[in-house]
Amino acid sequence: MEIRPLLMCFALCVVYATSKPTEKKERIHHDAPLSSREHDDAQGFDYDHDAFLGQKEAKSFDDLSPEESKRRLGVIVEKIDGDSDGFVTEVELRAWIKKAQKKYIYENVDRQWKDFDVNNDGMISWEEYRNVTYGTYLDDPEPDDGYNYQHMMARDERRFKMADQNRDQIANKEEFTAFLHPEEYDHMKDIVVLETMEDIDKNGDGFIDLNEYIGDMYNHEDEMEEPDWVATEREQFSEFRDKNKDGKMDREETMDWILPSDYDHAEAEAKHLVYESDSNKDGKLSKEEILNKYDLFVGSQATDFGEALVRHDEF
């Protein structure tokens, strides 16, 4: 069974506390790049292969005949068409690509699911999660390990409620994924910021000052010389993090720090696919248009090929 969200946080804190004091703690969340290659279709579709297949799976895709791959691409187009109107929009393409990006996250959730779905009803209630995660700890009101499990449980419950969009205290697979990986969901960003500020804001004033900011990432020891990157982070705080120059970061500034608005590679790829394939320029793609541009789409992760194109039982 894997370590749970706040228990994981405490475990990481222990590791950090015992690590070398010059090691930097990273809190910034970035989307993983679609590929390490340059995106240059004039030179081939290597970027698209890596981005949508994954580098390991790309070779298995090469084993399929063009005819079979094209047939399976047609099946996948129907999956991308979320509203089943016979067309694939840019929004649907972006959603599919983002889902492919999160494949490793869904696999992680699948591994944990059976641990929490105690009654095997295909859902996970807050009670199930609480009992599995905290049951043994709550039996001892005064544990000798120094952790406040009541506080940890309260924070987990708050996050669970935020992920539970229909407010029924029961999580389906997508809601549980948002609970375990809140940084991946727009509606969970506020809770990520709140939890981060609670962790770093030691004086409880609702802000993160320079000392708290540095103290979170650098474990100073008296006789150790401060590493160069700490001075760089002090400058980063003053010049870029603290936008209104009041000497501290509020929630908005903290969000800009830990959840930066990076370039949306999935959106750019979706726009690229539509632009290259939309022969009648109506802003959406028919199945025929996609299959006519077979080479482009086979080389794009809009198909999550690593699994979808070589998994025979789904076709």
Swiss-Prot record:
Binding site for Ca(2+) 3: 164, 166, 168, 175
Gene Ontology MF terms: calcium ion binding
Xref: Pfam families: EF-hand_5, EF-hand_7
Signal peptide: 1-19
Keywords of the record: Calcium, Endoplasmic reticulum, Glycoprotein, Golgi apparatus, Membrane, Metal-binding, Repeat, Sarcoplasmic reticulum, Secreted, Signal
Sites where the protein binds Ca(2+) 4: 201, 203, 205, 212
Main location per the UniProt record: endoplasmic reticulum
Residue positions binding Ca(2+) 5: 242, 244, 246, 248, 253
Domain called EF-hand: residue spans: 68-103, 104-139, 151-186, 188-223, 229-264, 265-300
Subunit: Interacts with ggcx.
Record's function text: Involved in regulation of vitamin K-dependent carboxylation of multiple N-terminal glutamate residues. Seems to inhibit gamma-carboxylase ggcx. Binds 7 calcium ions with a low affinity.
Name of the protein described by the UniProt record: Calumenin-A
Organism: Salmo salar
